[in-house]
């Protein structure tokens, strides 16, 4: 079992709170995955820390609160993980190339994903924490 808050092994490079809760492949008009990835990237500018020099792999802890329409928990992480993937940033023709933390979103680079979902009676929100594994 891994403890992401273990600062001897992990470095937190992003702790981002946004006032929305999105999922991958929402089929409603005007809600494209590319637009959502760009929203996350734009929100991360000025908040994200530089990646450590030697990263073994990456981990995500995502906490979502949602009012109203239910979300599929398995679709929450896809858009977020893709937001910081260099390959996806290039495919999106995004100007946020400096936010590419890993070349691809495979197990070779992203090994831990924790998603915590909560119902809210007041607001939608998402907290994204990204950790670099720096020591075994």
What does each model-found stretch correspond to?
Residues 1-136:
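Acidic, proline/glycine-enriched N-terminal capping motif
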């Amino acid at each position: 079992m891994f403890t992401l808050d273990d600062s001897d092994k992990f470095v937190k490079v992003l702790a981002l709170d946004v006032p929305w809760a999105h999922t991958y492949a929402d089929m409603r008009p005007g809600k494209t995955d590319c637009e959502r990835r760009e929203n996350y990237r734009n929100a991360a500018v000025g908040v994200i820390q530089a990646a450590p020099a030697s990263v073994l792999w990456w981990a995500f802890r995502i906490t979502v609160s949602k009012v109203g329409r239910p979300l599929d928990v398995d679709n929450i992480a896809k858009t977020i993980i893709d937001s910081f993937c260099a390959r996806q940033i290039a495919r999106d023709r995004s100007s946020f190339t400096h936010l590419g933390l890993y070349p691809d979103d495979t197990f070779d680079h992203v090994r831990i994903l924790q998603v915590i979902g909560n119902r809210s009676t007041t607001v939608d929100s998402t907290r994204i924490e990204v950790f670099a594994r720096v020591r075994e």
